[in-house]
Structures are given as C-alpha cells and as structure tokens.
C-alpha cells in the first residue's frame, strides 16, 4: 500500500480542494483512477443543507465495510486546528482559548465603535457584522493552503487501499470520499440518509488526519466494539504499525463517522 506515492501526487496536483472548480477537478481525477483500477465509481449527489457531491467506489448497500475520508479542505482564520481526541480536559481548554481569542477579536472593535459613536445601532451592527464575518471566514473564507494532514492524508489512505484491493475487487468493501465535512459533516449526513441500512449496519472506517504520528488511533463506538471485538488486533496485523484503541464515547473526534452507528474514527 503505497500511501506516500499518492500523497506526493495528490498534494502536487490538488493541494486545495475548496472551490467548486477545485473539487470538480479532483472528483474527475479520482473517478478516472478508480476506473483505471477496474472499479465501478460514480459521483453521488445528496442534499443536506447544501448540495453535496460524494465520490462512491463500489456498492454502499451491499458492502460490509465502508472505507471513507473527506476530500474537501478547510478555510483558515489563522487559528490552529488542535486535535486532542484522547485528552478531553486539554481539548476543552484549547477550544476555550480559541473561543476567547475570537471573542476578543470581535469585542475590541465593537468597543471602539461604541466609544467613538455612542450609537447603540452602530455598536450592535458592528457586533453582528463581525460575528457573521468570523463565521463566514471559518466556513467559507480564505482557503488553507496547507492540507497534507487535513485531509489529503485520509484521502490518500483510501486511494492506497483501493489500489491494494484492485486485483480482488471485493464486493463487500466500498470506498467513499465525502464532500463538505468542513461545513458540518454534510456529505456524510446526506449519504447516511440516502443509505439508511448502511448507516445502521455497516462498519465504517473513517480516516481523518492520519498524516502525523507514529501510531494509528482507532476510536471505536460501543456497537462496533461489541460486533467486531478483534478489530484492533486485525488492524495491527494488516497495517504493520502500532494501533491504539480508544472508546469513542470517551473521546472527542468530530468527523464523518459520527453519522454511522458502527462508525470508527481513525487518526494518527
């Protein structure tokens, strides 16, 4: 499984996948690669707040395992995206500090406007306007140019697994690259609604930010732990790298697996 080769190619050709054009070009690339490997692949549209365009390789309804990742890349406002899935107190502390910075960035200009104008209308308009601007920048603002970890790494993990299974083309495995994870897990939400049985019964292995770290972290929900008790050991043997298991119920990992009952989050 040559993940590094995929990483070099995808990062060189499609480092940012945020605009409609960028995402369309990347979808065409993946569909072509899947077809070259001999897979049946398609773009599947769904509606969940907005139109989402997922890349589906194989049959979601017949598969016993879905291997997934999101292919869209985030915006940036200069604040770090800190992931501490196994350390809830530190995770909440970091999130609180980031929220504090955002509050300061909103309220200092608002205070200046209030002092200069003395107008309640101008003050409230500034407050609301800055808040809306901050939310826009977080969701649809300046594209982050550095996306190797989030989530070119996960995308390339899926592509590498597709390549490794290409000779067998097992019917029980399907691959999905989700759209609009960065806008609120929307692509995964739409797919789960369109494939309700799969959302309840199919094991989902979702790779998000797997590019940094010496070990694989698998966050497994209770339903998946009960149905697949040997999941961790199987992952260790097949991957050849250290695997750390965590209980999803005790961790923080907001990614596409949240829309699936047997959704396993995988990061590094």
Cite the ranges covered by each PLM segment:
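Short secondary-structure junctions
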Residues: 38-45, 237-248
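N-terminal capping segment at the start of a domain
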Residues: 1-25, 31-33, 37, 139-145, ...
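Non-transmembrane, extramembrane segments of multi-pass ion/lipid transporters
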Residues: 70-84, 186
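A non-catalytic alpha/beta surface segment that caps or lines the substrate-entry region
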Residues: 15-62, 78-111
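Acidic/histidine-rich catalytic neighborhood of metal-dependent amide-processing enzymes
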Residues: 108-229, 249-252, 256-258
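Short beta-strand element of the alpha/beta-hydrolase
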Residues: 64-70
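Conserved beta-strand scaffold positions in the cores of enzyme catalytic domains, especially
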Residues: 64, 175, 204, 263-265
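Zn-dependent metallopeptidase/amidohydrolase metal-coordination segment
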Residues: 75, 247-268
């Amino acid at each position: 499984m040559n993940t590094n080769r995929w990483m070099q190619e995808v990062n060189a050709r499609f480092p940012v996948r945020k605009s409609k054009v960028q995402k369309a070009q990347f979808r065409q690339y993946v569909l072509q690669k899947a077809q070259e490997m001999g897979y049946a692949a398609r773009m599947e549209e769904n509606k969940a707040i907005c139109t989402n365009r997922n890349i589906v390789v194989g049959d979601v309804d017949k598969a016993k395992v879905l291997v997934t990742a999101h292919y869209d890349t985030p915006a940036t406002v200069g604040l770090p995206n800190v992931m501490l899935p196994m350390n809830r107190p530190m995770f909440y502390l970091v999130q609180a500090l980031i929220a504090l910075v955002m509050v300061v960035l909103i309220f200092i200009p608002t205070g200046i406007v209030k002092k200069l104008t003395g107008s309640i209308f101008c003050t409230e308009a500034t407050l609301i306007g800055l808040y809306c601007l901050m939310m826009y920048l977080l969701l649809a603002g300046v594209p982050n140019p550095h996306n190797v970890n989030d989530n070119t790494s996960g995308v390339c993990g899926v592509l590498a697994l597709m390549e490794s299974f290409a000779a067998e083309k097992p019917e029980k495995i399907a691959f999905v690259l989700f759209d609009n994870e960065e806008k609120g897990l929307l692509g995964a939400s739409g797919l789960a609604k369109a494939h309700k049985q799969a959302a309840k019964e199919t094991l989902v292995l979702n790779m998000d930010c797997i590019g940094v770290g010496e070990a694989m972290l698998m966050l497994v929900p209770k339903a998946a732990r009960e149905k697949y008790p040997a999941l961790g050991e199987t992952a260790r043997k097949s991957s050849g790298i250290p695997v750390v298991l965590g209980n999803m119920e005790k961790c923080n990992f907001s990614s596409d697996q949240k829309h699936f009952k047997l959704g396993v989050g995988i990061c590094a």
